Amino acid sequence: MGVYLNPGNEKFAKAVQSEIYVDKTGLIEYTNQVINTVQRYVCVTRPRRFGKSMTADMLTAYYGKECDSRELFSGLKISQNAVFAQHLNQYPTIFLNMQEFLSRSKEIGQVIDRVRRMLLRELKNSYPDVDYFDDTDLVESLQDIYAATKQSFVIIIDEWDCVFREYQQDKKAQEEYLDFLRDFLKDKVYVALAYLTGILPIKKYGTHSALNMFDEFTMLDPGPLAEYVGFTEQEVEELCGRYQMDLAEIKNWYDGYSFPGESSVYSPRSVVNAMRFRKIGNYWNQTETFEALQWYIDLNFDGLRDDVLQMMAGKKIPVNTGSFTNDMTTFRTEDDVLTLLIHLGYLGYEEQNKYVFIPNAEVQSEYASAVTVSQWGDISKALKNSADLLLSLIHISEPT
């Protein structure tokens, strides 16, 4: 086993062995349907704390060679599927967490170079007998391996969008990164399955996307993967029974996301923490969410401040998500900001009527905190008074 090539199943095993593990292996049924097909390119985006990395670890454990995951998946939902054994541990699997590469590099060229060098080292160690045309070229080396072995790869990229979050103002770096991914993945015979996961959908430049071969499943439309976005009503009911927690309180605090076919989706990490600690409260990362939310509120595009107030009062606001370009800086209208907040988990989205809203009390408390320190001129005092009242009501509703 390697670090990036066939890294094994240990990370997913730790998740399964945790005090609370909710079985989401049914998602593998979908990836098994599209593997080795034209639809083999899958991009799933969700907010932080919604289990993206665990899903990536699950797929790595299931598909990756050089480990035996049969016992690990025994008793889980996917083990009952007719083609479970057909794909289990059958593919050389590449797993990349782009945030790790980014944190060790000073600029995007170093990120890409490090990915190439690390993968090439492990590929050459695992396939020493392949006649490489150019063993310094990642794409050509993968093509040579496929030509020699007829084995195609499962490629899983976690935090795929970190470049767009860390290099928000550097369009050249973003384009260089997209070009690398396109060259690495698009129309390559050695790709059995490409699975990208992150927070932001795939970046678009004008009407063109460098990665337009991907099917995308987002907070706007997760399609057939809706039940895997977060915890479902049934899953939360079972946890509440197990931990003797009040379902109505849990629903008030952590529910509120909904999609066609899945009317109640809960924030998974918050539910897990509420169960483990037997305490309902705000489990979002305070510093990260507070600072980010405050910045977006203070942009105040097209009357955003008034709409935030209305949503804090329980109203729904119409939104047009079509113009959003899938980054964190290119805002032309209030709708673009609202759409980003959907992807970040700060807003729920009602697809049928095209409305956004604050999904639950946990997120409401983040808005209340952000508003209290925002500089909104003459209405700042009124906003702060409203926020103080909301915070008071939220704290009153907390169980003692």
List the predicted regions and their residue ranges.
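Conserved lysine of the Walker
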Residues: 52
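Residue-level detector of conserved catalytic or cofactor/ligand-binding positions
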Residues: 391-400
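Conserved helicase/translocase motor-coupling segment
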Residues: 282, 286, 295-340
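Short, amphipathic alpha-helical interaction segments positioned at domain boundaries
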Residues: 361-389
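Flexible phosphate/Mg2+-sensing switch loops adjacent to catalytic phosphate-binding sites
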Residues: 62-89, 208
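Substrate-engagement module of ASCE P-loop NTPases
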Residues: 144-146, 175-194
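Amphipathic alpha-helical segments of the small helical/lid subdomains adjacent to P-loop NTPase cores
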Residues: 206-212, 217-274, 307-308, 312
